[in-house]
């Protein structure tokens, strides 16, 4: 199996307080995770991150602080200037299951729904003083024999506990 390597991607466009920054991610490889360097804004001031493939949001993540909390729960270090968005199952020790759950943008003829475009949108709060998003890095690997058609799909399910009784958070 090919060894994953970190590759820089296109820089963000439209970075500013109260703006939506966009970066286009190249296709043709299997993307394991995406690392976004940031400064000039707190994690709470990075309001929403969307990963868009073929014009459809495949991951909609509310707040970099939530991403950081999930990453710490999974065993990663706290985001110290770098936000990590996982496409593969982090913590899986076997290479096969990790490979099958990553974002596959290869041109494998066995894949029914080929991903032709990938981009990342980041909403920055207007209270951020001088936000800077560095060039994102992607951990990628080349195509292997079997296609990866499983995808980690993060969605937000809104729930307002204010008017309800007791509830359990799991």
Regions found by a protein language model. Give the residues of each.
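Beta-strand-centric surfaces of beta-sandwich/beta-rich domains
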Residues: 1-170
């Amino acid at each position: 199996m090919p060894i994953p390597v970190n590759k820089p991607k296109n820089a963000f466009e439209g970075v500013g307080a109260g703006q939506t920054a966009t970066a286009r991610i190249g296709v043709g490889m299997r993307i394991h995770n995406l690392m976004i360097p940031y400064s000039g804004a707190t994690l709470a001031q990075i309001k929403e991150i969307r990963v868009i493939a073929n014009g459809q949001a495949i991951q909609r993540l509310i707040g970099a602080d939530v991403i950081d909390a999930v990453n710490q729960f999974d065993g990663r270090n706290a985001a110290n200037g770098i936000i990590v968005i996982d496409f593969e199952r982090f913590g899986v020790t076997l290479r096969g299951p990790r490979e099958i759950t990553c974002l596959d943008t290869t041109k494998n003829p066995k894949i029914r729904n080929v991903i032709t475009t990938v981009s990342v949108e980041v909403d920055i709060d207007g209270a951020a003083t001088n936000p800077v998003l560095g060039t994102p890095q992607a951990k990628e690997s080349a195509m292997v024999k079997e296609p990866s058609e499983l995808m980690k799909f993060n969605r937000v399910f809104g729930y307002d506990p204010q008017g309800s009784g007791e509830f359990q958070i799991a």
